[in-house]
Amino acid sequence: MDVDSIFKNTEETNKKRNPEEADSLEPASSRRRLAEENSDEENEEFDEEGGRFFGSGLKKSEKTVLDFLDEQEAQEEPASLTPTELKRMVVRLEKTINNNQELRIKYSTSPQRFIESEADLDLEIRSFNVLSEYPILIPIFLKLDCVSTFLELMNHENADITITVLELLIELTDEDVDPDALNSLFTSLIDSGLLPLLSNTIKRFDESNEEDRHGVYCVLSLMENLLSVDNSICSIIVENTTLVEWLLSRSSVDETSISTNLQYAVEILAIILANSKEAKLKVCNLNGIDLLLRRISPYRLRDPTQGSEEEMMENVFDCLCSLVQETKGKSLFLKEEGIELCILNMKHKGKSRYSTIKVLDYLLFGPLSTPYCIRFVEAGGLKYIFAAFMKISAADTLEHILAILASLFRSLPADTVERVRFLRKFIENDFEKMKRLFKIYDRLRIQLKGIDQSRKLDFSPDSEEKSTKWFLQQIDHGLFPFQSTVLILSWLCVENTVTLKKIKMLFSEASIPIDELTDALKNYHENLEEPTVESEEVEANDSYYRIDEKPMVTVLLGSMQASV
C-alpha cells in the first residue's frame, strides 16, 4: 500500500460540503448511501454525536492505515537497555569520535566536510541520556572508562558538542537518580578532574551568543547537582579552580534586566559560601564585600521585580550573611559602610528590609562584635530596628530582631552613650517595647512547655535519635527566639531598678513566678559550650574586650540571682 499517496491525495479532502445536501429531505438511508459515495470526511465533520469539531477528519482508508500502525506499535515491547547494548553504544561512540577527529584533521579548512560527522557525534552522545533510567548499569559505564571519554569531549573544538556533554552529565547527576549509582558516578567525575575542567569550560563561552549562554547555564546547573550530592567539594572548588572568582565576577555584572545566568551565578556562589570557610576568606580577599554591597545598593530606594531579580537579591544577602560570620568579613563590612546601607534598607521598608535584618543578626553576633554594635547605634540603627520589632510578626524575621537586641546587650560597653541610648528605647512610650517583649516571651514559654509535656509522655528508650527529635521539636516551636527573650529580660533586670520593677510587675500581672526567668537563663547557661579562640580572632579588634557567650552569661546569671 502506498501510504504517501493516501496522505498526499487532497482531491477528496478539499471538497466543500454542499449546503443543499444538508437540507435534503431524502430518507436517511439514501443520505447515508450518498455520503459513503462521496467521503467519510463529511460524516466525520457533521457527526450527530459531537458536531464537526469532534470528528477525526480522516477518510476510511486513512484511518485504516493509522489503525494498522497503532497495532504495530502496541505489539512492540518497549526497548530496554542491557549491558550488551550499553557496550555497543560505547563502541559506536568511540568510532564516531575517531571518525570525527580524522575528518577534522583531513579537512581542517573545510568545515562543511566534517560537520555531518559532528551531527552524528552529537546524536551518539545524546543516546546515553537513557542511562539515567538504568542506574544498575552505571558500574559498567564506569568500568568502560566512559567518564574519561566524555570529559575529553568537553574539550571538543565545537562548543555544541561540549554543551551536549554537559546536558548528559546534568541528566546523569540529577537528584532523582538512584543514590548509590549517583555517588559512584560523582566520585568518578570528581576524581577525573571535572571541577577544574568546568572552570576552564565556562570561560570558553561568550554570553553575547545565545548558544554560549545556554552553555554557561549548563555549567551552573551541573555545579548545583554536584554540590547537592556532596558540598565538601567546595574546598576543591576553592583550591583547584577559579570558579569562585568567575562566580563573583559574574555576580557583579550590571544588567538592565536580570538574566537567568546572573541569578544562577549568585545562587551557586551563595551555596559555596555557606559551606566553605576557605571560600568566604577568598571572596573577602577579592573585594567581594564591596562588590556584593554594590549589587544590593539599588534596593535601598526601590523593590526588586518579582522573579529572577528578587531571587537574585535574596541570594546576594545570603552571600553577605555567610561572609560576615568571619572576623575578616565583619571588618570589611564595617569598612565598606555596609551598616549604613543596611539602615537605609530598613528605612525604605521594602522587600530588602527582611534580608537586611538577617545580615545584621550575623554581623552583630559574636565575641568580637563590639565595634559593629557601636557603629550600628551611632548610625541611627536603633530607631529602625525597634520600629521593626514593634510591627513585624513574621516568626523568622522576629527571631533575627530578638537576636540583634540580645547582641547589643552583650556587646555595647557599660556606661557608654550607646548603651544608655539603647536602654532608653525600652523605657520610652510607657515601656511599650518591654510589654511586647514580655508577650513574646510568654507565648514562646507556653509553646515550649507543651513540647516538654509531650516529651514526658514519650516512654520510648532513650537514644541520641530521640534527643535529636525533641530538640528539633523545640526549635520548631521557638527555642532560639525564646532564649533571646530570656537574655534580654535578664539584662533589663540587672541594668537598673526602673526596668527591674517593670519586669516584676509584668510577671506578677501574668501570675508567672519571676524565678521561671532565672531558671530559663540557668538552663541556657548549662547548654552553652566552652569558648574557643580561632587564630584570626586573636589578632583582630585588640582595642576591644573579647566577650564570649558562656562567661558573659555566667556573670549575668549571678547578677540576676542577686537582683530578683
From Swiss-Prot:
Keywords: Coiled coil, mRNA processing, mRNA splicing, Nucleus, Phosphoprotein, Repeat, Spliceosome. The modification Phosphoserine is found at residue 39. GO terms for cellular component: nucleus; spliceosomal complex. Residues 465-528 form a coiled coil. InterPro entries: ARM-like (IPR011989), ARM-type_fold (IPR016024), CTNNBL1 (IPR039678), CTNNBL1_N (IPR013180). Residues 37-48 have a biased composition (Acidic residues). It comes from the Eukaryota. SMART domains: DUF1716 (SM01156). Residues 9-20 have a biased composition (Basic and acidic residues). Residues 1-56 are annotated as: Disordered. Transmembrane segments: none annotated. GO terms for biological process: mRNA cis splicing, via spliceosome. Its main location: nucleus. It is found in: Nucleus. HEAT repeats lie at residues 83-133, 138-177. ARM repeats lie at residues 179-229, 230-276, 277-326, 328-366, 367-411. Probable spliceosomal component involved in the activation of pre-mRNA splicing. This is Beta-catenin-like protein 1 homolog. It comes from Schizosaccharomyces pombe (strain 972 / ATCC 24843). The gene is ctnnbl1.
